[in-house]
Regions:
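Structural signature of eukaryotic scaffold interfaces centered on beta-propeller domains
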Residues: 26-41, 96-113, 141-158, 186-213, ...
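Beta-strand cores of modular interaction/reader domains in eukaryotic scaffold and signaling proteins
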Residues: 16, 48-50, 60-62, 106-108, ...
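Alpha-solenoid helical-repeat scaffolds
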Residues: 63-131, 141, 147-150, 155-167
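A short helix->beta-strand "capping" segment at the edge of beta-propeller domains
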Residues: 7-30, 82-102, 129-137, 241-254, ...
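Canonical pleckstrin homology
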Residues: 4-87, 155-156, 160-164, 171-173, ...
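Pleckstrin homology
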Residues: 1-53, 130-154, 173-196, 296, ...
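Surface-exposed loop/turn elements that mediate protein-protein interactions on large endomembrane-trafficking
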Residues: 80-84, 121-138, 165-187, 214-253, ...
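Intrinsically disordered, low-complexity regions in large eukaryotic scaffold subunits
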Residues: 44, 48-50, 57, 68-71, ...
């Protein structure tokens, strides 16, 4: 990342935005990462490079003329463009017209990626990506929307707002009358820290987590297939108002530690806690640490202070464990795999996503 600095020969502001293949951002704001320079510190035109990372630093070069500095900037921008093209995996598409004042807190696509629910501080909005010239439409006037997910097979939208989890069936959402849509919602949990939906034991499950400093209560729920039950019992559909009783409790359990994430394995849950990744057997509710304490090669994990487990991904029979400091592989027995492979982050990650094999 680089920035232009005003000098005695006059101010000139330039900024460049790029993204490396490792995801760290090289975007500029004036004066970031470097002390202010006096205008008479040197003669010439300054060009400041700032490295964004835990060990970040700034380096300022001086060009004798404005033309030579612009030439440097031109070549840097060209090189950045080529690097972005080489590492490009996804195409970025705007979800709202340019100039729309949006502060999106969360988003979840559905309908094969053709539509997306957007979480805003003032509610849930719906955007049709096939017509991005139109602004998002308010469908649920909920305050402080923090998290959303979609159970598309069951046509259910889950929303976490102000620490309360709600469910809404798709057919209850009416963009022409958002207030009426709210009346069809179902409040399924309060005092919620976060929730997660996924597949485990061949079931679609929703885990709702109430996490405290010393313990966590985790309630797992599964969807009620309203349409299937209505076909078998015609009166059931008439008795069940739209959006009501969409989930039922499957299991509920307690762990004596603070939790920050949940991940679904084939037959077990993996929970990220301040102690590390914990495995919970949903059939017996037995809990054990994911990492085997007998593996001496994992001592570097146990020695690391303030380590936070964030995500786990299954790749070719192994598990990629992502923490806030580093990532590494383990096998199904919790022993280190690919012993020479360790990825340390330059920045401070708060979330991960994997699109295998990219």
């Amino acid at each position: 990342m680089y920035e232009d600095v005003a000098t005695s020969k006059g101010p000139r502001t330039r900024a460049v935005l790029s993204r490396s293949s490792f995801g760290h951002r090289t975007c500029l704001a004036p004066g970031v990462g470097s002390p202010p320079l006096r205008q008479d510190a040197k003669s010439g035109y300054a060009l400041t490079f700032t490295y964004l990372g835990k060990q970040g630093y700034s380096l300022t070069l001086w060009a004798s003329t404005l033309a030579s500095r612009d030439k440097w900037i031109e070549h840097i921008e060209l090189r950045q463009h080529r690097l972005r093209q080489q590492s490009c995996v996804f195409d970025l598409l705007p979800v709202a017209p340019r100039g729309t004042p949006v502060v999106v807190t969360c988003a979840v696509p559905f309908d094969g990626g053709r539509q997306v629910f957007l979480g805003f501080p003032d509610g849930v909005y719906l955007q049709d990506l096939r017509d991005r010239s139109r602004s998002p439409t308010l469908v649920l006037p909920l305050r402080h929307v923090l998290q959303m997910d979609v159970l598309e097979e069951f046509q259910i939208l889950l929303v976490l707002a102000e620490h309360v989890v709600y469910t809404f069936t798709f057919d209850a959402l009416d963009p022409s009358d958002p207030v009426a849509s709210m009346r069809h919602g179902r409040r399924i949990a309060s005092h919620t820290s976060f929730f997660r939906a996924g597949m485990c034991l061949g079931r679609t499950l929703v885990c709702v987590v109430k996490s405290g400093a010393a313990s966590s209560t985790i309630k797992t729920l599964e969807p009620i297939d309203v349409h299937a039950r209505a076909k078998k019992h015609p009166t059931f559909g008439k008795m069940l108002p739209s959006g009501q009783d969409t989930l039922r409790v499957f299991k509920e359990f307690y762990i004596p530690t603070e939790s920050s994430s949940i991940h679904f394995l084939k037959s077990k849950l993996c929970i990220g806690t301040i102690k590390g990744f914990e495995i919970v057997d949903l059939e017996t509710l037995d809990t054990q640490g994911l990492l085997d304490p007998a593996d001496a090669s994992l001592e570097f994990v146990r020695r690391q202070e303030n380590l936070q487990p964030i995500a786990i991904f299954r790749i070719d029979g192994e598990f990629l464990l992502c923490y806030n400091e580093f990532a590494f592989y383990v096998n199904k027995n919790g022993w280190r795999a690919r012993a020479s492979w360790l990825l340390r982050w330059e920045g401070t990650p708060t979330a991960f996503a994997l699109h295998y094999p990219y």
